């Protein structure tokens, strides 16, 4: 058992993701001046690199091939690595079952830079082109038939976008490091496989042969997923035999080779489960790593209590230092830039993936929020665990995503169609809102039921699967919720007010949803909390069911109201402002702002929502990526209010543009994407 320490300096919150986290991050600098600042930078870097993952997937997905006719059951990867040059000699055994009758061939992914020396097994011949190995089988396979192939290959592993693949780099200036970075579709950059999230072999064996040597007086070792079964020494070489016996997607298979210093803990949970925590750090950062993982067992205990015991408890949980990049939730062995305390919130995120991402994997990247939104939400749950509900609420406000696009990704083959931060931030906020709709007990029971469901454990799930679990647990129809928050875009923009007859206590609450004025969904159906403050110092909270564009709710309150808070716990992703009752167009913004254009990306006309807090001479200008002004949308005095400003892109070519809104000393810029 482990005790969570709750002091400020042991539980700082990292507020970083995208630029709208900055203000709250500054507030926490006052409370935790050192740690919140360093964590903020760490998480910011992590998020940027995670966004790059999706762009890599979008490009890689274009060359993927139909592989639905077979199911991989087992891989055995045998790697022979040079420590002095980026060169790989290897072989792979793949065992599979045919899914369709008369299966004549199977296709595996492997980058074209490699040379295939031979293939044996159930094969008559093969072709290798366009990053695809097409193996013609030695007979027609019927559904359920088992087969195998063994591929011998060699070459220099290519690097994806200058960053990922099987990387040969150094740490401490000149000490070698070989490490794989394979998410979300890049395992085939270094080994043949059926890449992507859709296929999980039952187990993977990884043998890594390296020179038997030391660097800076420290032995070079090789680490991977699962359990180290054996180390064989022969002919001045060592072979590390790693065994992953749980189902795993190919891009979570990992290797890391360096002169690591390893240290260990043993986790003992409340259910009696016990497993090793194995850490691999560089000598120069060992002390910081040992300090940085002190609270990790407490995070494991928290997530085990919420979602069920750690899903890979028969093996381990490990973390391996990179010294660059961000982090990847490789199954049982997360790779991470550094394990020091400044990256602890990244460690929490990656740990959560062991339940949501590794154990239960999104069926395809349309449902990517089931991986990333869940892990991001777990950051907020850790904040709540260490700092209470107020800290949780504050953390959630750093995740408010108020741009366009759907959480269910529509187009995963087009980089412009992937709204990267939406699956992290809005995905997490969807769970926050679902908690508000269901209540704590039912919400957390739904998450636990989802994690325990045998249809998804060590397999795949879709958004529809998650919805069914929530509906079954809650005994509620949640179509309204998922339809508007997952499959539709944007958010409600509330105008509200109230009045009270102090003699009778009769109170009217007026709510109008304003977003239809900007071409968006006219009504979001949600329960809304309303908090009334009374002159005697008391308060009460009531919940109303808002399902119309304009609604008035009447109730009797026995005390005189002194104040009113709309959605005090911020359960709803929204904007809200006081409006004059009966004058629906009289919305008075409290601040200047330029909202993200919609649609975005767009072809033809896109609209901007402009909020003007006071009468001002304003300018709204469009610039291309080179800084050339291409359009003036507004250049005049405007009165306070909310305006919709269209831009007809005309003959402007596809590309990235910027919309700049200025009013006096205020200035704000939005990036927009024009796609022809």
Q: Can you say where each PLM-predicted feature lies in the sequence?
A:
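Extended, low-hydrophobicity, Ser/Thr/Pro/Gly-biased non-transmembrane segments
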Residues: 42-62, 66-67, 93, 150-260
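Hydrophobic helix-coil surface modules that form long, contiguous segments used
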Residues: 90, 195-348, 377
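Amphipathic alpha-helical substructures
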Residues: 100, 420-509
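Zinc-dependent metallopeptidase catalytic helix centered on the HExxH motif
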Residues: 335-393
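Acidic/His/Gly-enriched intrinsically disordered linker/tail segments
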Residues: 367-368, 372-437, 454-457
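Short, surface-exposed loop/turn motifs with a glycine/proline- and acidic-biased composition
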Residues: 633-665, 669
């Amino acid at each position: 058992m482990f005790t969570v320490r709750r002091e400020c300096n042991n539980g700082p919150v990292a507020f970083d993701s995208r630029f709208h986290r900055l203000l709250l991050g500054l507030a926490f600098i006052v409370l935790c001046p050192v740690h919140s600042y360093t964590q903020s930078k760490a998480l910011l870097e992590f998020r940027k690199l995670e966004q790059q993952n999706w762009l890599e997937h979008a490009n890689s997905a274009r060359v993927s091939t139909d592989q639905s006719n077979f199911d991989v059951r087992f891989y055995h990867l045998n790697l022979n690595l040079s420590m002095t040059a980026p060169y790989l000699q290897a072989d792979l055994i793949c065992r599979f079952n045919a899914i369709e009758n008369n299966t004549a061939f199977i296709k595996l992914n492997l980058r074209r830079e490699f040379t295939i020396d031979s293939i044996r097994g159930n094969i008559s011949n093969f072709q290798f082109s366009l990053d695809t190995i097409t193996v013609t089988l030695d007979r027609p396979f019927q559904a359920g038939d088992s087969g195998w192939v063994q591929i011998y290959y060699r070459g220099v592993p290519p690097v994806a976008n200058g960053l990922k693949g099987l990387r040969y780099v150094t740490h401490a200036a000149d000490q070698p490091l070989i490490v794989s970075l394979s998410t979300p579709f890049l395992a085939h950059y270094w080994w043949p496989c059926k890449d992507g999230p859709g296929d999980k072999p039952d187990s993977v064996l990884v043998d890594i042969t390296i020179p038997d040597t030391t660097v800076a007086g420290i032995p070079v070792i090789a680490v991977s997923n699962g359990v180290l079964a054996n180390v064989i020494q022969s002919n001045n070489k060592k072979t590390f035999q790693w065994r992953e016996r749980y189902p795993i997607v190919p891009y979570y298979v990992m290797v890391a080779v360096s002169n690591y210093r390893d240290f260990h803990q043993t986790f003992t949970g409340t259910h009696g489960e016990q497993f090793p925590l194995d850490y691999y750090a560089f000598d120069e950062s060992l002390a910081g790593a040992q300090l940085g993982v002190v609270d990790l067992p407490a995070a494991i205990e928290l997530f085990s209590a919420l979602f069920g015991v750690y899903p890979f408890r028969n093996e381990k949980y490990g973390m391996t230092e990179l010294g660059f990049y961000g982090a990847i939730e490789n199954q049982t062995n997360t790779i991470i830039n550094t394990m020091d305390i400044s990256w602890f919130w990244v460690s929490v995120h990656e740990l959560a993936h062991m339940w949501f991402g590794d154990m239960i994997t999104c069926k395809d990247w349309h449902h990517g929020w089931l991986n990333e939104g869940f892990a991001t939400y777990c950051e907020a749950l850790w904040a709540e665990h260490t700092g209470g509900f107020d800290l949780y609420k504050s953390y959630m406000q750093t995740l408010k995503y108020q741009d366009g696009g759907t959480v269910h990704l529509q187009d995963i083959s087009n980089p412009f169609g992937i709204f990267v931060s939406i699956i992290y931030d809005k995905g997490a906020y969807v769970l926050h809102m679902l908690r508000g709709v269901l209540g704590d007990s039912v919400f957390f029971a739904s998450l636990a039921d989802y994690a325990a469901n045998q249809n998804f454990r060590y397999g795949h799930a879709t958004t529809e699967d998650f919805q069914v679990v929530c509906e079954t647990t809650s005994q509620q129809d949640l179509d309204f919720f998922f339809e508007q928050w997952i499959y539709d875009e944007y958010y409600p923009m509330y105008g509200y007010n109230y009045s009270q007859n102090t003699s009778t206590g009769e109170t009217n609450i007026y709510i109008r949803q304003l977003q239809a004025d900007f071409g968006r969904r006219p009504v979001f159906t949600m329960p809304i909390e309303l908090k009334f403050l009374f002159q005697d110092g008391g308060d009460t909270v009531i919940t109303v069911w808002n399902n119309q564009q304009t609604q008035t709710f009447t109730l009797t309150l026995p005390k005189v109201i002194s104040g009113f808070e709309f959605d005090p716990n911020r359960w709803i992703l929204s904007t809200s402002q006081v409006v004059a009752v009966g004058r629906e167009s009289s919305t008075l913004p409290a601040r200047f702002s330029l909202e993200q254009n919609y649609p975005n990306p767009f072809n033809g006309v896109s609209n901007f929502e402009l909020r003007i807090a006071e009468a001002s001479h304003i300018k709204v200008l469009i610039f291309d990526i080179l800084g050339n002004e291409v359009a003036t949308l507004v250049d005049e005095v405007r009165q306070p209010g909310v305006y919709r400003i269209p831009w007809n892109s005309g003959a402007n070519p596809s590309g990235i543009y910027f919309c700049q809104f200025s009013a006096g000393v205020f200035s704000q810029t939005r990036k927009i994407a024009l796609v022809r």
